[in-house]
Amino acid sequence: MALDVKSRAKRYEKLDFLGEGQFATVYKARDKNTNQIVAIKKIKLGHRSEAKDGINRTALREIKLLQELSHPNIIGLLDAFGHKSNISLVFDFMETDLEVIIKDNSLVLTPSHIKAYMLMTLQGLEYLHQHWILHRDLKPNNLLLDENGVLKLADFGLAKSFGSPNRAYTHQVVTRWYRAPELLFGARMYGVGVDMWAVGCILAELLLRVPFLPGDSDLDQLTRIFETLGTPTEEQWPDMCSLPDYVTFKSFPGIPLHHIFSAAGDDLLDLIQGLFLFNPCARITATQALKMKYFSNRPGPTPGCQLPRPNCPVETLKEQSNPALAIKRKRTEALEQGGLPKKLIF
């Protein structure tokens, strides 16, 4: 068994260091058997005492789920093997991510580009939800793009099967800026709506080229949501007041969506409105979103091979584009993950 693990590890030739997070290091490598370029995510499992932090559970969950999934818009897990206190996951190599594209001010994102990114995101998400899986951590840097412009959902460390009646989940999921209001109010029972709200935030970020609702705390996040979209009433969201962490907010009128997204047509505004419905039971699903007029109306989505590619190194873009927001994003993610990331997080 040990020889098998060692031979599998030797199968991959490391080519470049891609990034490091609190629990994982990512390398670009070449599969010597197939000559395929891959990404290896080396996770530090640690000792049993550290397993209480969920490191082991997160890695095993990601492996288990990805082994069962196969879709053009879901990252492919090619191999997985353990050695000592580490486990290595071998993935499709992806050239960049949506956060890099959004931040590269030298790129012009046309309506057709944005439609293509949203189409691929929703197709991958529809597949997940049809297989009773919530991603629970959708954000631009978890939407990866390969050299052919194909977008794939990645980082399934927080993903979870759903559908069991009366089953409670943790509400401490999804990076705060993309977190649905029901999670911010402490909901323990939730469904696909948490992913759909995150998609709405990603779509808004594609249109505005900056994070839509960059809150500093859960309370500030809710305040930003209500100031922008209006404070929901009990008629709009019947179960709101019964949520564990519900607090009463000032009644904000909100800003009309066509004022925020002034270049968006009615079909796109309808999609945005459906994604940002406060009542999670009324919020549109991925399947419903894909059937909306926005995706059938002109212009059509840009083919993947014609989508823009970043002109600057990834690190330069992530650190130099809007430095204040970049620092704020890193600080927010670090606090939620319990430590400071050293470089890119795969």
UniProtKB/Swiss-Prot annotation:
EC number(s) recorded for this UniProt protein: 2.7.11.22, 2.7.11.23
Tissues of expression: Ubiquitous.
Modified residues (N-acetylalanine): A2
All copies of domain Protein kinase, residue ranges: 12-295
Binding site for ATP: L18, G19, E20, G21, Q22, F23, A24, T25, V26, K41
Modification note: Phosphorylation of Ser-164 during mitosis inactivates the enzyme. Phosphorylation of Thr-170 is required for activity. Phosphorylated at Ser-164 and Thr-170 by CDK2.
Main location: nucleus
Subcellular location: Nucleus; Cytoplasm; Cytoplasm, Perinuclear region
GO cellular component: CAK-ERCC2 complex; cyclin-dependent protein kinase holoenzyme complex; cytoplasm; cytosol; fibrillar center; male germ cell nucleus; nucleoplasm; nucleus
Molecular-function GO terms, alphabetical: ATP binding; ATP-dependent activity, acting on DNA; cyclin-dependent protein serine/threonine kinase activity; protein kinase activity; protein serine kinase activity; protein serine/threonine kinase activity; RNA polymerase II CTD heptapeptide repeat kinase activity; RNA polymerase II CTD heptapeptide repeat S5 kinase activity
Modified sites of kind Phosphothreonine: T170
Catalysis performed (reactions): L-seryl-[protein] + ATP = O-phospho-L-seryl-[protein] + ADP + H(+); L-threonyl-[protein] + ATP = O-phospho-L-threonyl-[protein] + ADP + H(+); [DNA-directed RNA polymerase] + ATP = phospho-[DNA-directed RNA polymerase] + ADP + H(+)
Free-text function comment from the UniProt entry: Serine/threonine kinase involved in cell cycle control and in RNA polymerase II-mediated RNA transcription. Cyclin-dependent kinases (CDKs) are activated by the binding to a cyclin and mediate the progression through the cell cycle. Each different complex controls a specific transition between 2 subsequent phases in the cell cycle. Required for both activation and complex formation of CDK1/cyclin-B during G2-M transition, and for activation of CDK2/cyclins during G1-S transition (but not complex formation). CDK7 is the catalytic subunit of the CDK-activating kinase (CAK) complex.
Family stated for the protein in its record: Belongs to the protein kinase superfamily. CMGC Ser/Thr protein kinase family. CDC2/CDKX subfamily.
Protein name as annotated: Cyclin-dependent kinase 7
